[in-house]
Amino acid sequence: MSFFGSEVARPRLFFRGLLGQAGPILITGGRAVADYREAFVGIDVAKLKNAIAVAESGRNGEVRYWGEVEASDAGIRRAIKQITAKFEHVYFCYEAGPTGYGLYRLIRSLGHECIVVAPSLIPRKPGDRVKTNRRDAISLARLLRAGELTAVWVPDEDHEAMRDLVRARTSAVETLRTHRQQVNAFMLKHGRIYPGKRSWTMRYLRWLQEQHFDHPAHQIALQEMVETVIAEFVPHWSLAAVVCALRALRGVDLIAAVTFATEVGDAGRFESPRQLMGYLGLVPGERSTGETTKRIGITKAGNSRVRTLLVECAWTYRYPPRIGKRKLYRLEEVSSSVREIAWKAQTRLTARYRMLSARGKKSTVVCTAVARELAGFMWAIAREARQTTS
């Protein structure tokens, strides 16, 4: 059996560099001469267009540049059909690279032989410093005919998918490690030492968010690095689904969603939204004596981090309800029930902001009132997300 999988009833000559496999080559006068009915095709692959060259069989066979075709299945099929119509046996090759093995599988599915070449093992002239798609395709075709190319092992689709998954995880871990090192170096440079024992826990991330610098540039740099680390950390967290669902709300970004999830925890421990509002200190206070009842400002009891963050989020509801492009992508990642709650929250809170502003209320009072109701919608979405994933 030849390297290309076809039986040829004639003498054999082993290809050099093709793993010791025999190729359909005639031995004539002590020289290797291919069958004249064969052709060897070199393809220089690229993102948009592939350059193709054809080497006819025989020591003196013509090696010509065939042209460029679109790097699509339809374009490749047309080119292969035109080339194979003139020869009995056609062999294809291209360099391994970022385009993967899709072209290899396409050529094999059409009934032709193909090898994926190891780029580091392609023979090159020491003084040849001109590299173009045309020259590379011609060189591949000529070397394939001469048997000077080394093929790489091509995995099947299942094996490739698993390998890509493992590589993606490894890359994500390396990226996360790099970002953590950058944050640690930044904090050490400015003399900020974490007092706890274990770093990179949720308590450590909260500590990072509480750090303040005198210079705005330092503050912005820290925030950017912390957000990057949190974005890498969240997908592996038990509350990842809750964070993703909360980001469907208008004004709630990554930091707001993560802060709410870390500080509140399981929203199911609150029997009603009003209990959560009280926990966050967003409900009005009261001073009553005898028959006199007096309402005062919010209690400001409980968790101040989430309360402050919700008031900041409430500012976005001063605009009319709409869904931006970035938020539209977020909505595609959540369930239909979460999308309904998010849209209901947007229509109600924008209307409430306008109504309170029309009554002459101060902007701080308006935002606090909107933040109180926003907490109720976040409670509903968090419970819905936990029920969906459980």
From Swiss-Prot:
Belongs to the transposase IS1111A/IS1328/IS1533 family. One of its GO terms (biological process) is DNA transposition. GO terms for molecular function: DNA binding; transposase activity. It comes from Sinorhizobium fredii (strain NBRC 101917 / NGR234). Keywords: DNA recombination, DNA-binding, Plasmid, Transposable element, Transposition. The keyword DNA-binding applies. This is Putative transposase y4qE.
